[in-house]
Amino acid sequence: CITSPGVLPDRTVSHRNHANMARMTKLILASSSPRRRLLLRAAGFDFEVESPDVDETVIEGEDPDRMVVRLARNKALAGATTPDAVVLGADTTVVLDGRILGKPEGEAEAAEMLQSIGGRTHVVITGWALAQGARIVEDGFETTLVAMRSVDPVEAAAYAASGEPLDKAGAYALQGDGARFVSSIGGPRSNVVGLPLKPVVEALRRAGIEPGL
């Protein structure tokens, strides 16, 4: 956790500002990702879903960890249209050799991206943010190392043609058929799927949101 400006550490970072925050029980997930919905539901939370339209353009030279937190904050604020609710936004990216790998734009790019991470270890970073009204009350990010086995061109093309990787950062789905390409995971598995549950659940509880409410 950091409480003053500075360089972000390599692992989870969290900013808190709960001094005047009213305890709320209504939760909104500002995400169109079905994986995040499943994770949050599996954690026992009741919530509504909004899919805010947010510009996800990468700023040249921006660090990936700061980028995902920025986008998560923008999503949470865009979804904060109900004053009596806490809104959760999140954004996930894959980083290989310092290069951000977003969602592939088609099958060819998906196959190429999958082959580029095959036989290597990449970093998955997910940023998250909680908003109430027009302000962010807490945010942070989590990193996970993922080692992949080698993927040959035929295998990559077949997987891309299945459609599964087309809306996934890094062009694979850990919770789906893409799991067969993963050889090991160093860090939270849920973070790779799209939401680091431990810090998010803790933050939601601090915001007055409890599982099962």
What are these regions (language model features)?
Residues 25-45:
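N-terminal beta1-alpha1 ligand-phosphate binding loop
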Residues 32, 52, 133:
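Cofactor-binding loop segments of dinucleotide-utilizing enzymes, especially the Rossmann-like FAD-
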Residues 22-28, 61-213:
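Anionic-ligand binding patches
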Residues 46-48, 210:
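Residue-level detector of anion-binding/catalytic polar loops
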Residues 10, 15-20:
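Intrinsic-disorder-associated, low-complexity terminal segments enriched in Asp/Asn/His/Tyr and depleted
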Residues 48-56:
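A short beta-strand-loop structural module common to alpha/beta enzyme folds
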